[in-house]
Amino acid sequence: MNDLIEDFLHFLIVERGLSANTIKAYERDLHYFVSYMDVTKELTDPNTLERSDIVGFMAFARQEGKSPRSVARYIASLRSFFHYLMHDGKMSHDPMIQIETPKQAQGLPKVLNLDDVEKLLSSSDTSTPLGLRDQAMMEILYATGLRVTELVSLKMDDLHLHMGFIQTIGKGDKERIIPLGKTATTVLEKYLEEARPKLRRPKYRNDFVFLNHHGQGLTRQGFWKILKGIAKESGIEKPITPHTLRHSFATHLLENGADLRSVQELLGHADISTTQIYTHVTKLRLKDVYKQFHPRA
């Protein structure tokens, strides 16, 4: 089975162009399933799999405390894997027939109000090169709605500041062009002129925009650590994740009259239904404003 999994992962890289993080997620999910099957029965041929094996695996995952979201992801990964095997002639039947994906409550994105955004964007120590970098990253995230992976993957050639935009490669290797406002442009230019040259190291000749203190490109994990420090410094009590500024970017655009299709394009969503979740957020926020300020609310 491990050889078949490797073939599948290679297919996802070459034919589907999926990101390294997505490939790792598939790999973890499939090996988790195989480790379960190794205990229940020796699995050398996928054609011996039955629906009962999948049902048993789902029950096992729940017993181990896996969330409905995780179980749903396992099922999606297995479904894709088995479809690949059947299409490739390595599997004659689909054991996923009549397997339902666990229902999961869809939580609304956590969004900052404008005051909290201002606190977050002004909480970096801009007297240091690292502080200038951190401020620039926060400004870019809120100004563009980039995913964190897209942010840390930015190269110098992706910046077109004289024209007021940046370009990025998002999910599915889709390129998109995103406008950059004056404030974010000014902060980014200051970082590029005053801080980035001090962070560069001769032995690392890379062109990533955002560098760590070793002169290497910043990682997602590195950014998460930075964000936790900034969030603590800001004094904001709400939980803040790497996606918080992206959620706030989308919600504030819609609140100020942007149309849904434009926001979808800026976020890089393949399906507009993904973007529509933010309309629910704006409705709830309007309801809160009404309750707070209407004399008869």
Swiss-Prot record:
| Complex formation | Forms a cyclic heterotetrameric complex composed of two molecules of XerC and two molecules of XerD.
GO terms under cellular component: cytoplasm; Holliday junction resolvase complex
Q: Does the keyword Flavoprotein apply?
A: no
Gene that encodes it: xerD
Alphabetical GO biological process terms: cell division; chromosome segregation; DNA recombination; DNA transposition; resolution of DNA recombination intermediates
Q: What is this protein called?
A: Tyrosine recombinase XerD
Where does the protein principally reside?
cytoplasm
Q: Which residues form the Core-binding (CB) domain?
A: 1-86
Q: Where in the cell is it found?
A: Cytoplasm
What GO molecular function annotations does the UniProt record carry, in alphabetical order? DNA binding; tyrosine-based site-specific recombinase activity
Domain of life of the source: Bacteria
The organism of origin for this protein: Listeria monocytogenes serovar 1/2a (strain ATCC BAA-679 / EGD-e)
* CDD domains linked to this entry: INT_XerDC_C (cd00798)
| UniProt-listed PROSITE patterns | CB, TYR_RECOMBINASE
